[in-house]
C-alpha cells in the first residue's frame, strides 16, 4: 500500500495538472522536486524508524506469546520513545531547510520551492515514524492484516482529499504535501487505536512527546539564529575582503 500511494500520487498529480493545461514538462519538474528532494530527505529519519520496528518484532512477539502483556507493553513503550527521540528532532530540518537544500540539491531554479515544501511538510516525519513503529507492533502480536487494512483506509481518504485539492485549488505541489501529511496522520491514528485495542496500551505523553518536542523547538530556534548570525558575519567578512581587493 505504501508503494501504491506513491504511484497514485504521481498519477493523480500528472493527470490533473494536464487537465488544467499545465505543460507536462512543468508538471514533471514539480513532481520531481517532491519525490526527488522533499521525499528523499523526509525518508532518512523514517528509515531509522523502519529499522527500529523490524528490530523490536521478536521481543514483542516473544512476550506476547508468553502472555506477559505487561512486558510486551514495556517493549512497545521503549520502541515508541526511542523512535520519537529520533524523529521529533528531525523536524528541525525545517529550520535549516535552505542550507540543507543548498548543499544537497543546489539547483537554483527549484531550491526555493524545495525549501518551502520541506518546511511545510517536515512534521509528517513524526506521523510516518510512529505509524511505522505501530505497524511493527501489530505484526509482532500477529495482527498482520490490521496495518494493511488501516493503510488501505488511509489511502482512500488520502485520494478523497488530494483530488479536490488538485482540481479546485492552485496549491499544486502543496496539495501533495498536505495530502501525504493527512495520509500519514491517519495511518498513525488508526494503527495506534488498534494497538490500544489489542494490547490495552496507553501512551505516556510527557517523556515520549512533550519533552522531545520542547527540546526540538528550542534546538530549531537556536540553530536558525546561529546559522543566520554566522552567515551574516561571514558575508560581511568576505564582502569586505573582496571590496578591499
For every predicted segment, state its role.
Residues 145, 155-189, 203, 207, ...:
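Membrane-interface helix-loop junctions in multi-pass transport and translocation proteins
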Residues 131-142, 192-209:
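Alpha-helical transmembrane segments
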Residues 123-153:
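Membrane-interface junctions at transmembrane-helix termini in multi-pass inner-membrane proteins
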Residues 76-127, 160:
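Alpha-helical transmembrane segments of multi-pass membrane transport and lipid-handling proteins
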Amino acid at each position: 500500500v505504501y508503494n501504491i500511494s506513491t504511484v497514485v500520487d504521481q498519477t493523480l498529480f500528472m493527470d490533473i495538472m494536464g487537465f488544467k493545461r499545465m505543460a507536462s514538462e512543468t508538471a514533471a519538474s514539480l513532481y520531481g522536486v517532491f519525490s526527488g528532494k522533499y521525499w528523499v530527505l523526509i525518508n532518512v529519519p523514517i528509515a531509522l524508524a523502519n529499522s527500529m520496528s523490524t528490530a523490536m518484532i521478536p521481543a514483542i512477539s516473544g512476550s506476547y506469546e508468553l502472555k506477559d502483556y505487561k512486558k510486551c507493553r514495556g517493549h512497545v513503550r521503549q520502541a515508541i520513545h526511542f523512535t520519537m527521540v529520533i524523529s521529533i528532532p528531525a523536524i528541525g530540518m525545517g529550520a535549516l531547510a535552505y542550507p540543507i537544500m543548498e548543499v544537497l540539491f543546489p539547483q537554483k531554479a527549484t531550491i526555493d520551492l524545495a525549501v518551502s515544501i520541506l518546511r511545510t511538510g517536515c512534521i509528517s516525519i513524526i506521523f510516518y515514524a510512529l505509524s511505522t513503529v505501530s505497524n511493527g507492533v501489530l505484526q509482532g502480536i500477529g495482527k498482520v492484516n490490521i496495518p494493511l487494512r488501516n493503510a488501505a483506509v488511509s489511502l482512500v481518504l488520502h485520494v478523497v482529499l488530494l483530488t479536490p485539492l488538485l482540481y479546485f485549488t492552485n496549491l499544486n505541489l502543496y496539495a501533495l504535501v498536505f495530502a501525504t501529511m493527512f495520509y500519514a496522520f491517519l495511518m498513525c491514528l488508526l494503527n495506534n487505536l488498534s494497538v490500544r485495542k489489542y494490547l490495552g496500551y496507553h501512551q505516556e505523553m510527557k517523556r515520549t512527546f512533550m519533552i522531545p518536542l520542547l527540546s526540538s523547538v528550542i534546538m530549531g530556534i537556536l540553530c536558525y539564529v546561529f546559522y543566520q548570525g554566522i552567515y551574516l558575519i561571514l558575508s560581511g567578512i568576505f564582502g569586505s575582503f573582496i571590496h578591499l581587493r
